[in-house]
Structure formats: structure tokens, C-alpha cells
Amino acid sequence: MIPRTGILLVALLLLACQQPPTRETLNSQLPERPYSGVVRAGHTYYFAGRVSVSDSTRALTEGRTAAEVRNIMESYRTLFDDLGLEFSDVVQGNVFLADVNDYAEMNAVYAEYFATDPPARTTVAVAALPGGANVEIAFIAVRAAR
């Protein structure tokens, strides 16, 4: 019984002595905003929410939400490529919709990027989003060993 207790105590001591993950701000091109675009802590990446409103999407009456979701996801693809990540590294998604009636339209495009083994996700309907956007999406990703 004592050897097991000793091993457990040594394991707990080693865990307590580990260095916490280093926090690093990445892709911080938002000097006018009080938040970071991406924060990395160890192998975990926390992405601020992204919206995609442009004159072309604002002019859409049908398919606007789908166009915004596709633009957001493609901007994530570019960012992930820069950081050496893939959509398969995403473990949590948070989606904010200005109109809950756009859920099916958003979901159809979102599913294209997570065809197999999708991450956990929360979807929330909100009163409004910055810039008149219909959709905002934020992710948490963990870099997988490759």
C-alpha cells in the first residue's frame, strides 16, 4: 500500500512543478480594440469571434448568411494555414446569429468544413452583431501532434 501512495505523491509533486503554458498573443492587428485576435496557451489556440460583412454581402437578400459563414470560414482557413492548424484541430465552436431563423442556412455551410468528427458547438441567437453582421464565429483549437 505504501509504494502506491509514494508513487502517487511523486506524480502529484511532478504535476505541481510543471510550468504553466506560456501565453502568447498572435495575429494582433487590432490596435483600436481591447482584445486579441488569437491567443495561444501551450498547444491551445483561442480565436476571437470573426464577422464578415462587406458591401457585397450586405447587398444580398437571399443567401446572405451563407455567404457570411463561407467568408468567415475561409478567413479561418487562411489563418489556420498561417498557424499550422487545420479545421480538424478545432475542439469548440461558438456561433452567434442575429436571427435564429438563419440557423439552417448557417448550419449547411458550417457542416461543409466539419464533414467528419465535428467539434463541440454552441449556437446563440443575439439581438445584434457588430457592423450589422448576421453571423459571428469563434473557435478554440488544439494543435494535434502530426
Where are the predicted features?
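N-terminal secretory signal peptides that target proteins for export/translocation
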Residues: 1-2
